[in-house]
Amino acid sequence: GFSLLSKAMVPKPDLTGQMSGRSVMTRDAAHSRKIVYGRAKIGGNVVYLESTGSGNKYLWLVVAVAGHEIDAYESVWFNDEKIWGSSQGYYNNWGNVVSISFYEGDQTAADSALVSASNSKWTADHKLLDTAYMVLKLEHDPEKFSSGLPNISTIIRGKKVLDPSDNSTAWSQNPALCIYDYLRDSKYGLSE
């Protein structure tokens, strides 16, 4: 509790410099779900990976970032390079070899492009309900991917929380509201 309160009194950190190296992408189909409050750089968990196309030209990845609905995606990073931003789109011609579909956790259908490309391995039943995730389609490019698969991370605005003062639910970095949400959450928190 004290940790969250002390964070509220410290100036807002530069997420790009201080948080790089803290977000590590993992591969585990049965990985536990993360709860994310406030703004955070998340490495995510690769829950599906498949090559498609002639000569395995494309690599598809499904990267789960939170086990609940989130407010928004702000940016996507490959290693320490920002490749996509919510207001600018793709950087440095990354849009030529990468396409990203974002799901905030409120989706009711599976990613249709992946369903079409996967030869029935990823089906319409793979909706990942109540999970925030990204679907990335990477085109083989020896120049862009010279060191192999990059560490993929994203800066997100996490879980929406209830503000009992006005009975509204919205994204917040207020530590008291985040703690209140965690304490009363019957799925992930301490409530029964």
Model-derived regions, located:
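Polar, S/T/G-rich
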Residues: 2-192
